[in-house]
Amino acid sequence: RASWHMALSAVAALLLLPAAIQAAGTESREFAAGEPLSSGPGGMSAQDFIEYASVNDEDIHELYFSVILYEGTQSCLMCHQDQGEQALEMGHFKWQGKSENIVRFESGEFGKNQLLNNFCIAVPTNEGRCTQCHAGYGYDHKSYDFTDPTNVDCLVCHDQTGAYAKDLTTAGKPVPGIDLNLVAQSVDAVPQRKNCIGCHAKAGGGDNVKHGDISTDLIATTREYDVHMGTDGGDMKCVACHGTNHDPKDGSVNHGNAGMSLHSVHEGEMKVCTDCHGNQQNIHAGTEAEDMIGPGWHERLACQTCHIPAIARKISTKVEWYWADAGQNVDPIPIDPDTGRPEYDKKKGSFKWENNVRPVLRYSNGKWNRKLIGADDNYTTEPIQLAVPQGDYNDPEAMIYPFKLMVGNQPVDPNTKTILVPHLFGKKSGPNPYWGKFDWNLALQDAAAYTGQDYSGEYAFAATEMLMSVNHEIAPAEMALGAGPSPDGCMDCHSSDYVDWTVIGWTDDPMNGGARVSATPSGLSAGAVRLD
């Protein structure tokens, strides 16, 4: 590429100014292969760069941003205006969307902005901190302009240098000092694992805190920890399964991603195991598992149930979080001896960490019961079920899946029976963030004024539970539950205390004479299914 670099240097004084592009006409020039790049009387248009790069087999982004100063998203929109408009509608930017998988809210528009959880609890009033992982810039208040395409952060998904990073407390702005021109030169249409995992692994405030099956290790892991993403295995990108929607008018990618986390937004069809591997009988033919998988035998087991025997196998995950303990001056901070992670934080309370967490089992038909701010944020009993999959044995669409169970406690109003949102960070949504004043009452007043929640002025801490889908850290076949000759493989599940049979429709382990019973109601405590 030395030839065009020499040509560019000859006209750099002209082309370094964005005005040279803006002044160009709509008609693109014609270039011959090997022709030195030079501007015409009206300057270079974006289309001129595309034409030149195509004729000379050059990377358009590297060429363009070698001579044009990257000035934010508006630089991307010079060529990608349609994509910018599409991105305004994506769940990664709006943090909500068509919620057809949330029971009773299938026709509504909900998502991360409304969901309650028992990690950092909720987004409202805390936008300035949460939006470190927002695919945009400046979302620090509910007044944020979601209609302005220049607010979209293109680089966070398309950077290929690995150097791009968002600052912790600046509402999604990049870390100071990054050479954004080099980042812009590197962009590619297809996000790599680091683009996706860089944000999703940090959900909940740290590496693998929330999901348990999505850690930064998966960026460059081995087949032992994930057969699909391992560099010595499938080496697959996230988008291989989390595919994008396509515009119905012209077929172009419209930035909607299937399989959004937290089962909140439907933006396309997610790849499932059988799309690539075929049905259970075919894939297991000729293996030791062939006799176990068939009509009448384990046909209601989802693939993940056996092929994810444990999560957090390399990087630990948080399994308990107690907000009631926050606000104390603890010194020294206790460190978990097994994981090396802190068990206390004055801002957040006390925690429990684990490696090699065995998922819990529940029937699921793909729908979820969720708690939503202002729509369904009340409770009657404890532990409050914040996220429970829909389905049971009598539901022909439901199968047994693995889930991560998270337990803890968090603020509630004992009088109005409301699961409360606390104002934790920043002062744009109120003057009394808990992480500044450590006064729960003031922080809850701030949030109630901001969200419209019903707060009587009295608070307590209620026990909560939530279940989260487990789909990553697929182990090699030889590590799957049931692998190995019978009866040894059978004992992976059919042994004492491994499975709570009552929640999946049995009086006891069928190998011990258990009988089939009616399905357990969806409201059953998730804790009853923990696999210890």
Task: Map each language-model feature to its residues.
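Sequence context of c-type cytochrome heme-c attachment sites
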Residues: A23-Q192, G198-M270, T274-G294, P402-V407, ...
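Repeat-solenoid scaffold signature
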Residues: E269-E382, A387-P389
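Bacterial N-terminal signal peptides that target proteins for export
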Residues: R1-S9
